[in-house]
Amino acid sequence: MKFAYRFSNLLGTVYRCGNLNFTHDGNSVISPVGNRVTVFDLKNNRSNTLPLATKYNIKCVGLSPDGRLAIIVDEGGAALLVSLVCRSVLHHFHFKGSVHSVSFSPDGRKFVVTKGNIAQMYHAPGKKREFNAFVLDKTYFGPYDETTCIDWTDDSKCFVVGSKDMSTWVFGAERWDNLIYYALSGHKDAIVACFFESNSLDLYSLSQDGALCVWQCDTPPEGLRLKAPRGWKADILQREKEEEEEDEEEGDRETTIRGKTTPAEQERVGKVKYSRLAKYFLNKEGDFNNLTSAAYHKKTHLLVTGFASGIFHLHELPEFNLIHSLSISDQRVASVAINSSGDWIAFGCSGMGQLLVWEWQSESYVLKQQGHFNSMVALAYSPDGQYIVTGGDDGKVKVWNTLSGFCFVTLTEHSSGVTGVTFTTTGHVIVTSSLDGTVRAFDLHRYRNFRTFTSPRPTQFSCVAVDSSGEIVSAGAQDSFEIFVWSMQTGRLLDVLSGHEGPVSGLCFNPMKSILASASWDKTVRLWDMFDSWRTKETLTLTSDALAVTFRPDGAELAVATLNSQITFWDPENAVQVGSIEGRHDLKTGRKELDKITAKHSAKGKAFTTLCYSADGQSILAGGMSKFVCLYHVREQILVKRFELSCNLSLDAMEEFLNRRKMTEFGNLALIDQDAGEENGVAVPLPGVRKGDMSSRHFKPEIRVTSLRFSPTGRCWAATSTEGLLIFSLDAQMLFDPFELDTSVTPGRIREALRQREFTRAILMAFRLNEKKLAQEALEAVPQNEIEVVSTSLPELYVVKVLEFLAASFEESRHLEFYLIWTQKLLMSHGQRLKSRAGQLLPVVQFLQKGLQRHLDDVSKLCDWNRFNIQYVLAVSKQRGMKRTLEPVDTEEDSDASDEDSLHLLRAAGEEEEEEMLI
């Protein structure tokens, strides 16, 4: 088994905080999600998270005009220069202060950041290699409060900065003689956004109270004059002074009097001036809805404003005509962005974690995604690995597509937190348990709740399990310590299993036998036999409270996680412990800012809360109250690899040691409400509160892993944590893993064998080298009529390798029919021999089925659409042939005559029929 799993995607969370951006082509949205960045491709319906992370939550993102570079700045002021082409970090930089916004100039040569009450302009990184990618050019002073927003003119000559001191400042990017800086006032609240008009120095400024000021400049952009160098200026001033002295002498001779302007008046002559043309108010009279975000499209003169109540307005400027107004959420609209064409508008709501893309002309949603409001608790893979279902504390159940990364259905029938989710073996039914006292079954075809299982007395269910046939549903209670068993077909309660003396923490059915394993806080694991009237077959005594239980895929082994950070392995047939793992030191828990004790002592109360076997059963994943997920080898009982889910220091319990400089005699400085001016201040959680309303919105949520699952294909695994749903997968492109390699296997010899038409030898050498491009070249070089001969000559060991390659190629390659022929010939030739190793080949077969099923769905939809269109066209063409031509309008006499003629014809036809009948 390979262990080179790497982070591949982040699901379950679509937006946290920061500003949204559209890419250069306008088809993708770049959204900051915690300390990561996700790119939503709206054209191809895919989402992908960049393989990079900052130390804190991302605060602002700036894109270069060509869309190739991005500057990502977190809350601590650390910046990353990222290439969106190769998806890698090019440079690290620290601004040594909190940055509110960053913006590139339209020509891409410079960028400006607003930090504190100043604005700093840097030279943008070029295409050549440089020792320092960020070179400071100028620092602009003026505002006395924090600066909030930036906008550039189209020619990159000037930029405008808004501030919390209710003023707007226009600065020159170059040393202009008639514009150094210009301060504009007239607002009664902090500036939220400011925008230049297209090809003009006219600008708009918006404040938090919903006021819009229109400013007109008396100078066009071409009227800006460069300031002369100091040497030239001194010569010019000296020349002017000499001319003035000569004029004075001539005046004395001719007794004429000439007036002089003061130096202040001379300074004002020829300078840029602004005047306020109009002032509009976005709020109605008596409405105190705060403006939170705004965006302006210069080509179409479209202004989009978002408010704290979840409402957004569309106005046409400068006439301020209202185009549209809509409420999209109950929470504040934190960010607004418009794409390059001006058709799509992106909205981000940080409170609910919503990301919306609205097409304002057709008044329809292009994208509408929302994560779980509270933390996710449980997850499950579908049998084919295509879908992931998650349940959260907000009572919602969401189904995610692993290929696109989007949630395509949200089930909201539960009225309280979801505690467990699972798929049936068919993959068409989802079963969930909740604290509202119900277990529900959902149909994935119609997205409806077709079964609701309840207990005779109201109880809170903590876990759920379904047997391999999909007919038996069981759920454990955390208050009555009982296990309830229902029938899926009838919905009737079959039995109530009693015996546990503590809350039931986990349930799991044996995949091969009719045995149910239940773990409880009473330090026991009970095995119940379904065919023996649900009697207790065995009781496994543990040394501590059981927190999780799971069976190996072949059902021959049982793993239990306990409160003392141990994982014990049992033989379910003989009820004998076969191994144990001590994982206390592998968890590496951190210290929370509220903890009075060190991380070393608090680790005694931390343990693994979720377990999952790999697809082949050789390894097991374990996660719990830590930022790490541990991968153990079951037989050797050793730690193989430890995966760090997050490095986000905005979460609590991330560090093992706290900064002693923050520990004062009054307590930890982190608990002092320092950000009261931002929104609602810092909410400190109540003692003992781990989840719920206070936990989801307090300043630093605690990092923890709530659920782990391996994909049935074995290529990836998923984890639900405070950060969201993270997927780790095997990246074949980054891994060189040869198979039975020797010195005779080289790319040159592989291509030489292909030229000599020795296809079998070339394929064997290509898979021994295990290079994807060489394997693809070797397989695609085989003529279609020789595939059957080559496939029969392959050894059985290499057949599995070829099937794995074909399964991966179905997700990328366009040669669908060619690879289908390869798959068919391999399975027909080696199917009987592969059947003897069905257990080991199950991940490969499921991986193959996943790719084939996706192509089947796509092709079937396209074929159905074409077939229905052809049927419609044929039906319309037949109806057109049946239509009669329009008759000319006749006079009354002609119409009477035609009526009489028709009557005569009818009578004549009737007489002929009577004669025929008589004959």
UniProtKB/Swiss-Prot annotation:
In-chain residues carrying the UniProt-annotated modification Phosphothreonine: T891
GO biological process: ribosomal small subunit biogenesis
InterPro entries, per the entry: G-protein_beta_WD-40_rep, PWP2, Quinoprotein_ADH-like_sf, SSU_processome_Utp12, WD40/YVTN_repeat-like_dom_sf, WD40_repeat_CS, WD40_rpt
Keywords associated with the record: Acetylation, Nucleus, Phosphoprotein, Repeat, WD repeat
WD repeats: 12-50, 53-93, 94-132, 142-181, 186-225, 286-325, 328-368, 371-410, 413-452, 456-498, 499-538, 541-580, 603-642, 700-740
List of residues that carry Phosphoserine: S895, S898, S902
GO CC, any one term: nucleolus
Subcellular location: Nucleus, Nucleolus
Compositional bias (Acidic residues): 242-252, 889-900
Record region (Disordered): 238-266, 885-919
PANTHER family per the UniProt record, alphabetical: PERIODIC TRYPTOPHAN PROTEIN 2 HOMOLOG, WD40 REPEAT PROTEIN
Function: Part of the small subunit (SSU) processome, first precursor of the small eukaryotic ribosomal subunit. During the assembly of the SSU processome in the nucleolus, many ribosome biogenesis factors, an RNA chaperone and ribosomal proteins associate with the nascent pre-rRNA and work in concert to generate RNA folding, modifications, rearrangements and cleavage as well as targeted degradation of pre-ribosomal RNA by the RNA exosome.
Name assigned to this protein: Periodic tryptophan protein 2 homolog
Taxonomic placement: Eukaryota, Metazoa, Chordata, Craniata, Vertebrata
Gene: Pwp2
